[in-house]
């Protein structure tokens, strides 16, 4: 079975300057976990739920955060105050950050003519869950682990292709 038989055609994509809050809205609206990131018609990256979780993890406030008493406040070095302000600002403005700041730049892709088994093996090898499908440099679909499972299940039940 070919990738073209199992892929989702016309995948949801987003421009590289899309704010993260809009990307998250696209994830939720379309029940997806990743978006191909485009500059014009060119695929330039991939942003996934994992990228967002990693960002939140890196922006987390330390568990050993020390909050001074009013008497100790005078003794806090000014650099600690500046770092705290930067952290608060970063946490407040994550939603405004463009996806290009956190996306994966090296995108592993598939072609329509690739066998589904080869696409599955590539996903396993690369530790990813979806592959944009390209025809030349144009994105024509996306294939996910769920698409592969659906296609295999459909072939076993006598149906043709994914639903």
Task: Please provide the spans of the model-predicted regions.
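Tandem CBS (Cystathionine beta-synthase) repeat/Bateman regulatory domains
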Residues: 1-163
